[in-house]
Amino acid sequence: MTQHHPTQSPQFFLTAPSPCPYLEGQFERKVFTHLVGPKASELNDLLTQGGFRRSQNIAYRPACETCRACVSVRILAQQFKPSKNMQRVLKLNSDLIGTAHRAEPSTEQYSLFRTYLDARHRRGGMSDMTVLDYAMMVEDSHVDTKVIEYRRRGPDSFITGKGEGELIAVALTDQMADGLSMVYSFYNPDMQERSLGTFMILDHIRRATAAGLPHVYLGYWVNGSRKMAYKVRFTPQEHLGPNGWERVE
């Protein structure tokens, strides 16, 4: 009788072509593998450093036949200096505090998530996500994932590290050996004047710096894509190219 032993090496798969969400007229393909088992965090670190992104228990990266427009971006947190506009954003949101929780969904989170999608990404690929879909996005992780909730500071926040009142913004974040990876973030769309998306990235840079971690991973940047243009404002950063990670000022 032949015995079958589980393989220690990850198995990779290739998706069928589908319309690219970033470049009109292009088609995308992805290579992916499953992040499960006791080595999931170690594998996720290695793959993220190689340009992969995590979605639930899947790690993926673009594998398009004729296009290399998607570029992995990571901020050099220890060397980062905020611009004057970013300093203004930090000051504007100094009344907020982010609290890291276990990766557990809540109805309050989903309500904000739904409001954000309906206002900002009504026709996007996530627009029809149900509360169960959201729960899977948060919970289905075999790596060190946190939900960071942002609320207004209260009189005891300096002691408790927690905010009070309504939930204003949320970041789903992976803790890695060499940095923080921002998996997904959303916020109250009625507070545009706060630039909450920028603020959450700045807060993650602060968290990485305080923890002695060198990087904040932002995922992919596509030159010419307006929805991704914000990612290259946080310098210095590194872009993953054919010769590895290359510094960009």
Swiss-Prot record:
Keywords carried by this UniProt record: Acyltransferase, Cytoplasm, Transferase
GO cellular component terms attached to this protein's record: cytoplasm
UniProt-listed Enzyme Commission number(s): 2.3.2.29
Recorded superkingdom: Bacteria
Catalytic activity line of the entry: N-terminal L-glutamyl-[protein] + L-leucyl-tRNA(Leu) = N-terminal L-leucyl-L-glutamyl-[protein] + tRNA(Leu) + H(+); N-terminal L-aspartyl-[protein] + L-leucyl-tRNA(Leu) = N-terminal L-leucyl-L-aspartyl-[protein] + tRNA(Leu) + H(+)
Transmembrane parts of this sequence: none
Gene Ontology molecular function: arginyl-tRNA--protein transferase activity; leucyl-tRNA--protein transferase activity
Subcellular location: Cytoplasm
SUPFAM superfamilies linked to this entry: Acyl-CoA N-acyltransferases (Nat) (SSF55729)
GO biological process: ubiquitin-dependent protein catabolic process via the N-end rule pathway
Record has Acyltransferase as a keyword: yes
Function of the molecule: Functions in the N-end rule pathway of protein degradation where it conjugates Leu from its aminoacyl-tRNA to the N-termini of proteins containing an N-terminal aspartate or glutamate.
Stated family: Belongs to the R-transferase family. Bpt subfamily.
Protein name: Aspartate/glutamate leucyltransferase
Originating species: Chelativorans sp. (strain BNC1)
Chain's gene name: bpt
